[in-house]
Amino acid sequence: MRLLYTDTGLNNPLLPVYSLTAAEIALANLNPTIWSPATVDFIKPGVGQKVSALANRIDGGKFNSQASLEPTKKYNGSTLQGINFSGAAGLFGDTPVALNGTINTFAFIYQLPSGALPSTPTDRIVIATQETTPHGVGIRTTSAGSFPVFFNGGSQPDVPFTPSNMGAGLFCAVVMCSNKNTGAYAIAYQRSDQTAVTTRQVTGYTIPAYTTSQKMNLGGAGDGSVSPLTSVLSDAIVIPGLYAYGTSTQDVIFAYLMERIGEITG
């Protein structure tokens, strides 16, 4: 697991502290229409040249524009239809939970074209609600929770999401948790091969109060417990910057996630 962070927030590039992987190089060399306006500049090691992480799938497919992926009402007070996790062990319920102004959780689940639920579009954006209790900030794996989902820019009703209907496709799950009061953001994601993860597709985690030098705790069951993640976890980053809520934040996050997902799937 690797860690990178920036203290400077939204208006500065995120500086990678590692060499580019083959997938990262391939992604940086892509020149499709940029998923406007989402780009993030990175310093290319050994060159001193900024490169853009484009919000496009590594397989060449494209997501819709940022505007079409945003709900009409977002963040504070938002309650949307979502994926129903009730069919998987440890993933119960579909009761909507509203976000609040202090601690928000954001989840991104990326499905490769050959993946599950073939009757619906293959580009999937999942924005998850959060727990408001102090001990369990994060994806609900043991409590009732609704997971709003956007299919190709449009909101659709609950869709069953269980190991039995995942098919042969690979899901990459990304989770972000943020504390507005401290400006602390944490992102965790894992590669959910069905052979390695069968009863949970998004691993729960907790986020303690931390400074820029502290790492977040990953693992657990979503109820405050902390346990080691399995080998399917590919990466984690902590971005303790005072980001403003809204489209600009999502632009930065999504562009970066696309760059990281390129490494996972490429």
Which residues are covered by each model-predicted region?
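Extracytoplasmic low-complexity segments
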Residues: 1-87, 249-266
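Short hydrophobic/aromatic patches on beta-strands that form ligand-binding or substrate-lining surfaces
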Residues: 34-37, 42-43, 56, 105-114, ...
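Short, aromatic/His-centered strand-loop micro-motif at the edge of beta-sheets
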Residues: 94, 148-176
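Short tryptophan-centered beta-strand motifs in secreted/extracellular beta-sheet-rich domains
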Residues: 106-108, 164-180, 185-187
